[in-house]
Amino acid sequence: MARKGPKRHLKRLAAPTSWYIHRKAYKWAVRPSPGPHSMKTSIPLIYIVRDYLGYAKTAREARKILNEGKILVDGRVRKDYKFPVGIMDVVSIPETGEHYRVLPNRIGKLILHPISEEEAKLKPFRINNKRMVKGAKVQLNLHDGSNHLVSLAEKDAYKTSYTVIMQVPERQIVKVLPFEVGAYVFVTQGKNVARKGKIVEVRQFPMGWPDVVTIEDENGELFDTLKEYAFVIGKDKPEISLP
């Protein structure tokens, strides 16, 4: 008989390698709910509370903390223990005054990078693409699965691969960072994940091959990565703190 509906289970051995979990301790893992990020680039909120922050010893304790509304993601209370928390998301715990940004490390694992309360009010969004919608609006489709509407007159200010920095949870754009030579980028995937530096060159290829970006890191070393892996986070210097 054919399977009906999406999968609702996940074995730990098959979980994304970006998760910091014990793969052989138990058989099953929590499968993220459909939401802002893909499963590969996010982790269920319950693991943030229990395994990363250590605020609970069991899943039951972690779910109780979430149900009490003590954990905020991008400034909003999230109670769904399966909620996917991904790259550039801000996790806040008001009771303790802690704030973290989710970023990958050099081995591709998702980590919680401590940030200040002021920085927790800002979140960078990468523009994956854009499209026209009713009402003379342009819809910006962002890296975390969300979207943002801008007026038709502003459409040329927002291009694919640009980054918009928004206030959260209000989602008001405060700065636009163009994808261009000299821009400061952070690599989110690939063998050079978590490396950072300035764009030196953008090479385009025919026949549908992906664009390649050459980046110069802080030590003057050059390396290449795919354009889709390069996340602009500043012009001359990063607008957010990094590990």
UniProtKB/Swiss-Prot annotation:
Q: Which SUPFAM superfamilies does the protein's record reference?
A: Alpha-L RNA-binding motif
* InterPro entries reported in the protein's UniProt record: Rib_uL2_dom2, Ribosomal_eS4, Ribosomal_eS4_central_region, Ribosomal_eS4_central_sf, Ribosomal_eS4_KOW, Ribosomal_eS4_N, Ribosomal_eS4_N_CS, S4_RNA-bd
Domain of life, source organism: Archaea
Pfam families given in the database record: Ribosomal_S4e, RS4NT, S4
Question: Which molecular-function annotations from GO does this UniProt entry contain?
Answer: RNA binding; rRNA binding; structural constituent of ribosome
Q: Name one GO biological process term.
A: translation
Q: Where is the S4 RNA-binding domain?
A: 43-105
Q: Which UniProt keywords apply?
A: Ribonucleoprotein, Ribosomal protein, RNA-binding, rRNA-binding
- Gene Ontology CC terms, in alphabetical order: cytosolic small ribosomal subunit
Do the record's keywords include Lyase? no
| Annotated PANTHER family | 30S/40S RIBOSOMAL PROTEIN S4, SMALL RIBOSOMAL SUBUNIT PROTEIN ES4
Q: Which family does it belong to?
A: Belongs to the eukaryotic ribosomal protein eS4 family.
Summary of subunit composition and partner proteins = Part of the 30S ribosomal subunit.
Protein's name according to its UniProt entry: Small ribosomal subunit protein eS4
The organism named in the record is Thermococcus kodakarensis (strain ATCC BAA-918 / JCM 12380 / KOD1) (Pyrococcus kodakaraensis (strain KOD1))
